[in-house]
């Protein structure tokens, strides 16, 4: 796979150029010989909220993993506009309960990209961690073990870790799945605020209400892109019925 860092713009009919934060072309990826992404081509607009929508197994998590750099694509091109490396928040189930880490230690891991694993945190690093924990409302959980936290608390700690990376590209895999309404609303408001502050946010979601409130939508089925654009144009009743119709 080819990875490039540059600037790309597209011009909608009758509109102004829209900057792309990420463009991917003919991506292919999978697990141990099982293909998941198949000739996937699309883009993520900068300074916007993009929702990845599709059934289980459609390739949402794999695409996020490729964009985050934690999954290697076997073919295709991936182009990033100028910016910091992406921050990735995996599904809650991907983070084990038995990890012997406190909430604060988990958030501090967000500084490893800049400091390295063995170098001590600087005063600035600690300030960044404090700020991220305060923003997510988890400062009072600093000394608690990760495995002791509720689902909503743990998810906020993981998002705080991503904020500690100070990235302008945030990738989240089902960030509100399984959370109570209050926790979902809190995270939704935070992500909206981050976009307003200049962060590009991409989230995989089964929540059609959340997808409809996004700025852009990528519709996936069987590892292929079957729709891309504004949610009101992509998430039509016909498209959604086809999406979950048995193959």
Where are the predicted features?
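Conserved ABC ATPase "signature" region
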Residues: 123-141
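Conserved ABC ATPase signature
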Residues: 145-149, 153
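Helix-to-loop junction immediately C-terminal to a conserved catalytic motif
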Residues: 68
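Helix N-cap at the start of a conserved alpha-helix in ABC-type nucleotide-binding domains
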Residues: 181-183
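H-loop (His-switch) and adjacent beta-strand-loop-beta switch element
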Residues: 214-230
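Catalytic Walker B motif of ABC-type/P-loop ATPase nucleotide-binding domains
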Residues: 170-174
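The feature captures the beta-strand-to-loop junction immediately N-terminal to the Walker
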Residues: 53-55
């Amino acid at each position: 796979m080819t990875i490039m860092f540059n600037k790309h713009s597209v011009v909608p009919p009758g509109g102004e150029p829209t900057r792309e934060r990420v463009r991917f072309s003919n991506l292919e990826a999978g697990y141990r010989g099982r293909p998941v992404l198949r000739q996937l081509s699309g883009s993520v607009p900068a300074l916007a909220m993009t929702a990845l929508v599709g059934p289980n197994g459609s390739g949402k998590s794999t695409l996020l993993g490729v964009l985050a750099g934690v999954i290697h694509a076997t073919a295709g091109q991936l182009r990033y506009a100028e910016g910091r490396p992406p921050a990735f928040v995996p599904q809650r189930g991907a983070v084990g309960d038995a990890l012997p880490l406190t909430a604060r230690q988990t958030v501090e891991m967000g500084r490893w990209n800049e400091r390295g694993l063995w170098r001590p945190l600087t005063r600035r690093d600690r300030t960044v961690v404090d700020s991220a924990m305060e923003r997510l409302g988890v400062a009072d959980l600093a000394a608690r073990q990760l495995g002791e936290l509720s689902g909503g608390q743990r998810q906020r700690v993981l998002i705080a870790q991503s904020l500690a990376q100070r990235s302008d590209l945030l990738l989240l895999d089902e960030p509100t799945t399984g959370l109570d309404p209050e926790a979902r609303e809190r995270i939704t408001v935070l992500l909206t605020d981050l976009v307003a502050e200049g962060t590009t946010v991409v989230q995989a979601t089964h929540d059609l209400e959340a997808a409809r409130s996004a700025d852009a939508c990528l519709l996936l089925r069987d590892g292929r892109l079957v729709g891309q654009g504004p949610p009101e144009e992509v998430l039509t009743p016909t498209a959604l019925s086809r999406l979950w119709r048995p193959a």
